[in-house]
């Protein structure tokens, strides 16, 4: 009889950038990437992990960019929130086609499109093994989807925020510019701030730090990386309260 792998986490908040959905399309959503991610998330449900999900909207719209060009920042951020809802609808559809129960909850009311965000219902769905997708950020302008991920992670009492990126984790320098950059295995929140390592925006990062919510940074484009992270294998970088820095060989 085949035994089910034991996960390192009971409940996670998975944060994906909107750009992660682009694939080779250059803009919008690549259906092949969406389906691959849905299958990776399905593998987590199959080992008993409860999954909350926040997706950015940068593949469709970036409010901050147009704000610099003169658009009112509040209007731009509202448009960005709607972009995250579009990504959430696409992911919900991909999950359901992969036979994974999922609910889409929006921080702004969109009757007939998705559910309103409700903390108690979200917890209930998670306990039932349903993937809960949190869309529209925090519902407020001037807050990023990274802030939304940390906020929802704290609210649902996630064991960690898993941040899927284009790189293998957190490095001591930009790996694109410095081929000798070292990858951290574990690092303390304070050292990330002191070294000015780019993980997420300051508001999101300090929120996670103040609530002792670990952040795990990994490469979502690497096949199987998400599964390895959840199973506690040596993948990516963990940011938490710790006294020593652990670098990978």
From Swiss-Prot:
One BP annotation, GO: 'de novo' CTP biosynthetic process
Family: Belongs to the UMP kinase family.
Keywords on record: Allosteric enzyme, ATP-binding, Cytoplasm, Kinase, Nucleotide-binding, Pyrimidine biosynthesis, Transferase
Residues annotated as binding UMP: 57, 77, 138-145
Protein name: Uridylate kinase
Physiological role: Catalyzes the reversible phosphorylation of UMP to UDP.
EC number: 2.7.4.22
Organism for this UniProt entry: Psychromonas ingrahamii (strain DSM 17664 / CCUG 51855 / 37)
């Amino acid at each position: 009889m085949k035994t089910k792998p034991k996960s390192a986490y009971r409940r996670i908040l998975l944060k994906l950038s909107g750009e992660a959905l682009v694939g080779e399309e250059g803009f919008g959503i690549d259906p092949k990437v969406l389906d691959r991610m849905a299958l990776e998330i399905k593998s987590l449900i199959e080992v008993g992990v409860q999954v909350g999900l926040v997706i950015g909207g940068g593949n469709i719209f970036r409010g901050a960019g147009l704000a610099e060009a003169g658009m009112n920042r509040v209007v731009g951020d509202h448009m960005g929130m709607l972009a995250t809802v579009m990504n959430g609808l696409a992911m919900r559809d991909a999950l359901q086609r992969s036979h994974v129960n999922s609910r889409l909850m929006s921080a702004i009311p969109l009757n007939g499109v998705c559910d309103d965000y409700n903390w108690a219902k979200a917890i209930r769905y998670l306990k039932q093994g349903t993937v809960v997708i949190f869309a529209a950020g925090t519902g407020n302008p001037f807050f990023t989807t990274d802030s939304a991920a940390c906020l929802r992670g704290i609210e649902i009492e996630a064991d960690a925020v898993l941040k899927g990126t284009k790189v293998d984790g957190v490095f001591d320098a930009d790996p694109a510019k410095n081929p000798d950059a070292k990858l951290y295995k574990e690092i303390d929140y304070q050292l990330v701030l002191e070294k000015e390592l780019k993980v997420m925006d300051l508001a999101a990062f300090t929120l996670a730090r103040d609530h002792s919510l670990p952040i795990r940074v990994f490469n979502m484009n690497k096949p199987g990386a998400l599964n390895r992270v959840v199973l506690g294998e040596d993948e990516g970088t963990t940011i938490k309260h710790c006294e020593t820095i652990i670098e990978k060989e």
